[in-house]
Amino acid sequence: MNVLQAPFVEEMVKTTKNLYRLGWDERNGGNISYLLKEEEILPFLNPTQVLRKIPMKFDATKLAGKYFIVTGSGKYFKNVCDASSENLGILRVSENGQELELLWGLEDEAVPTSELPSHFMSHIARLAVDPENRIVMHNHASHLLAMSFTHELDEKVFTRTLWQMCTECLVVFPDGVGIIPWLVPGTNEIGVATAEKMKESRLVLWPQHGIYGTGRDMDEVFGLIETAEKAAEVYTYVCAQGGVRQTISDADLWRLAEAFGVTPKVGYLEEKVSKRRKL
């Protein structure tokens, strides 16, 4: 069967096209990695046929033998649909965790995204929390990026602002938003910082840069970032209209959490409200 007909390739094509349409992945900005199961690739590829090996600059032993489809370095999301094999690659992490075995794509000696260290470290962190985690997505969601210039970069305060902008936010990301300091992209340092935040939050903000999101499937991750971005957009409108005059109270957020069976990140809502609702 043609690899281009594989459901996971089609998902990557549709998602990158949509992200480019939204303006969140200008030029070659943004990247996606998708953890694949061997049974998913077997109808389309022979895993013993390695096209070439690509060295890595960090130890990925914890992902040894695992398969991924990833976006390429310097590749434009707008081109993925028409030239998938040039802009995407299916890889396996070698048994020693020091190199990648290319099984398909990344033609003309292309290499995976320069953010692969951050992706792989985030996969490792999230798999330790949720063994079903499969997607890591990075993009430059416009309003979240803008908020990193104008809003206090305290995780609790930032998260609460988003929760209060749209009722669905607490339901979609009760674990809040992690925030790292500004760091040089494409380095192991930013990967380590991101992965540390991923232990507790599925969303991590890179100030003055973009957002990282993780989840079990493409819809979940895209929806996660999309929801936070919508809240950031509403925040932008609210500020432009003169600021907040009324919002969702902590008491109402507790009621919301109870109704949808989610647990807000500890300490992010007024504890006295939590106790009152238990009486």
Curated annotation (Swiss-Prot):
Keywords, comma-separated and alphabetical: Cytoplasm, Lyase, Metal-binding, Rhamnose metabolism, Zinc
Compartments (UniProt record): Cytoplasm
Source domain of life: Bacteria
Signal peptide: none
GO biological process: pentose catabolic process; rhamnose catabolic process
Active site (catalytic residues): E115
Enzyme class: lyase
UniProt GO cellular component terms: cytosol
Pathway: Carbohydrate degradation; L-rhamnose degradation; glycerone phosphate from L-rhamnose: step 3/3
Family: Belongs to the aldolase class II family. RhaD subfamily.
Protein's job: Catalyzes the reversible cleavage of L-rhamnulose-1-phosphate to dihydroxyacetone phosphate (DHAP) and L-lactaldehyde.
Protein name, per record: Rhamnulose-1-phosphate aldolase
The organism of origin for this protein: Enterococcus faecalis (strain ATCC 700802 / V583)
